[in-house]
């Protein structure tokens, strides 16, 4: 019923009739949108064949109705619009799923736009109607044509031929419509009511399309200049320009409007034009043509598409009947110079250039002053031996079609002189021409693309040092490889003064001496290593040129060693860039330099806490500004870690407790992280169990309880491996800044914050949850309960279990001498409050924040800081 009722719409000459026509076409398009590619292609072919068969009568009708152009050339245009458009798109998919990646879970689907409003110019009425209706049929769009009043009969005739053939081939009735009695009001209405406008015409019409509130594919005025270089083939250039300019009496918008000839060939170019039947105007004739061409600054419509003899008569003089083109010589590029404007007829302006750069200047000035930006530019040059000129031309001209060695009217529309250039009768001019498209308009511009995106989890990895040696007394055995396996010659040791003076490096140097490996030691690492410290070490490194770097100590020594390693291998490394925050370490903007090309890196911990021996992290401080640069990249992962309990037996109680709780925090945050995996979970759980069991013994009897020391060393390294891959959370973000602003030891800072952060993270209804594909919903409470259960802590329910778990952590902290609050560590209240807002913002921006299961608001971080300070 809908299809038969739609055909009752009669002549479209009022807004009411157009409203009915719009409804008719929309109804037909809704049906057409369900067609398969096979059905569409059948219709597309049938319509193209019908249009091609009617190419001659349509050409005659267009010339008779408009009084412009040449029948024989319009036959070619009609043929082109049917044949070349069909050939270009006959095998192009425009329906349904066109791309699917099952591995990535993406699918892309072509969908029609809906109703297209097509504004048709008087210069190319039938060919443009054929072109636009065909590409709409290919894309399952409905179309309503608004013809130019001077060309309405021929335009509608072309549209009706395509429509009848399409319906006969199976298209829904009403899929193509037109305005029978065109007016500005009806044109504006269809532009407003359509889904997209295909606008071809003058600047005013294009501006109206873009101002309609409807998405528009508009084109602009052409004003192509053809530069003839001194190296050009003059005969080819001149005759191609004549061929182009006389085609349909110059009415294709890409046609040459001016010629710019180099002074060395100017006279030869002029002679060739004359030889081939062109007429050079004298000064008096040129002035008459100027006055005829432009009326009140606008192109005189009466000259468009006319023969030279006709135009000359309008101007009041005569030229030979067989004159091909009228040529006016000019020097000014100002808007007042009529020969510098678009003419759409058989008139050319001609300029003389001093050299190639001057030719570019003239061409550019004509575009800027007289219109045509974005449309077309033409070059004739020896493109083999003068390639640089072609490149300069391409760089300078602000046009979307840069036509080389080609008649631009036929070359600009595509596919005739270069088969990789899409055929079209709607030529986009890009932003330079005020357009939304910068290429020849085709079927892709009339399609919406739906993208179906299924959730996919990231590819994950587990990264660790190539070799990890552990057990008491493993150091000399591990170092054997430097000689027996790797053949190393020189080793550079990085440590701090305390460890050096207390003989911690002696076991290393003795072994190196035994193997005949030369060595030097840098022992000036400060607790918070600075860039100055690292540079001092690097100077020594460069002088010594080692092939091995051995960092021994706590986190500071290992961090300093990593930084020196970076500067040694990459002196131009920029810490600001390397410290840049990222969401995904694999997608960071900055690519970390490849490490290990100069030196093999070994990390040996002397405390059980940081895990730095197995992590890709380091922190360096700029001593001039106080800025800390946290670096994170797997290139910073040590090549070898040696975890020898002999190096940890004499660690003082304060270091033992602080580093032990630091390791516990590593395990807890790695387990709660949005990036936690089965590979990291096992390490984190085992580390927690070992810490709860052995930290008190290591704290009480550190120098004699070998078992406790060894298990704490294992726990620290396992927790390090866990957070090296799962990353950390806001406890570490806040602890980093608490330490930076108030100089609390890192382990202590973590200890003061961890249970508060656990309560914060465990909220089943957080304001915001962390963002990572693997993390599907807030479940941190359950995760903490899993940790508790692994320790044998079980409550009545999850909330009770969490409370008991937190009580156990607080008891462990108290057992190893950790105080309750930030205030208890002597941090001045006023100073704390004065720095609080800065701490909060810096903590929010810390690299660790992104992996937290609850994405924090700054106000929430502030509240936790205050609670940690006051203990309530």
For the regions a protein language model found, what residue spans apply to each?
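N-terminal Rossmann-like NAD(P)+-binding subdomain of aldehyde/semialdehyde dehydrogenases
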Residues: 2-107, 135, 275
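Conserved C-terminal structural/oligomerization subdomain of aldehyde/semialdehyde dehydrogenase
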Residues: 3, 7, 33, 317-458
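ALDH superfamily catalytic-core signature
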Residues: 5, 12-14, 206-334, 361
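Glycine/threonine-rich beta-strand-loop-alpha-helix active-site module
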Residues: 87, 93, 158, 532-646
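Rossmann-like NAD(P) dinucleotide-binding subdomain of oxidoreductase/dehydrogenase enzymes
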Residues: 97-236
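Carboxylate- and glycine-rich phosphate/diphosphate-binding segment that chelates Mg2+/Mn2+
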Residues: 267, 275, 614-726
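ATP/NTP phosphate-donor binding region
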Residues: 459-548, 822-823
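Gly/Pro-rich interdomain helix-loop hinge
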Residues: 741-833, 871
